[in-house]
């Protein structure tokens, strides 16, 4: 988005990650980061306040999430609550805070970065998939409500995307199965029709499009970025 002229404000829990990404200067727009924990209500509200102190928001990308793999029967209420706060309530709070100014200006974009797990349930990711399905539902509901105000709200459902999170997951699987992380990633990629994992840049390209005026009639959709892995009509 910065490459296309947007002034970007983001947050992350890791101060080093915030510092590294904030140093990006190749785009036409600025990039600034704030250390915040989207799984904590007060931290999220402080982040929102900091952002609004710099002016209104035209584009909101709800891109937060953790996807622990765990057994449903051994999960406690706290496990569900913590992931619900991080994955879903962060999007609820940010959307609620930034939407009014978009409505007033009669222009805005909100994107829910959900997951293919929100549409195709996986028992090992039951809590993650539940929160991501809720994001899709919220996006669809709000799109129907606020589309007439010029605010377009859509969801993006990434499939297998080669990220640091997947690197860690592959490492855990490799350790448990006696393989290397590279072998795990390669084997998983074979299950995708294009034969590989996707990249963050390929997801970002869709984000840029949906935030542009070229997507002025796209509202309430849930678009999969999965290399053709989904088999439904």
Residue ranges, per PLM feature:
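Short, small/polar-rich loop/turn modules that mediate ligand/substrate recognition or access, typified
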Residues: 147, 152, 218-220
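Short C-terminal tail/terminal secondary-structure segment
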Residues: 120, 196, 208, 219-233
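Conserved glycine-rich Rossmann-like NAD(P)H-binding loop of the short-chain dehydrogenase/reductase
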Residues: 6-20
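Active-site helix of classical SDR
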Residues: 95, 131, 139
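Substrate-binding pocket helix/loop in short-chain dehydrogenase/reductase
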Residues: 71-72, 79-84, 188
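Alpha-helical segment proximal to the catalytic Tyr-Lys
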Residues: 100, 144-145, 216
């Amino acid at each position: 988005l910065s490459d296309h002229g947007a002034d970007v404000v983001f947050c992350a829990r890791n101060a080093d990650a915030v510092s590294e990404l904030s140093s990006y200067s190749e785009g036409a727009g600025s990039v600034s980061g704030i250390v915040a924990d989207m799984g904590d209500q007060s931290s999220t509200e402080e982040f929102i306040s900091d952002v609004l102190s710099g002016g209104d928001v035209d584009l909101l990308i709800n891109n937060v999430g953790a996807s622990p793999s765990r057994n449903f029967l051994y999960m406690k209420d706290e496990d569900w609550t913590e992931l619900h706060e991080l994955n879903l309530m962060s999007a609820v709070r940010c959307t609620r805070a930034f939407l009014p100014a978009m409505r007033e200006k009669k222009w805005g974009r909100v994107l829910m970065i959900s997951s293919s797990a929100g549409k195709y349930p996986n028992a090992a990711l039951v809590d993650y998939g539940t929160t991501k399905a809720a994001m899709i539902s919220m996006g669809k509901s709000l799109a129907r409500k606020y589309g007439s105000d010029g605010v377009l709200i859509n969801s993006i459902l990434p499939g297998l995307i080669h990220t640091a999170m997947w690197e860690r997951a592959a490492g855990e699987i490799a350790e448990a199965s006696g393989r290397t992380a590279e072998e795990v990633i390669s084997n998983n990629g074979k299950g995708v029709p294009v034969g590989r994992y996707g990249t963050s840049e390929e997801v970002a390209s869709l984000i840029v499009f949906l935030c542009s005026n070229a997507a002025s009639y796209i509202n309430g959709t849930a678009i999969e970025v999965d290399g053709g892995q989904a088999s439904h009509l």
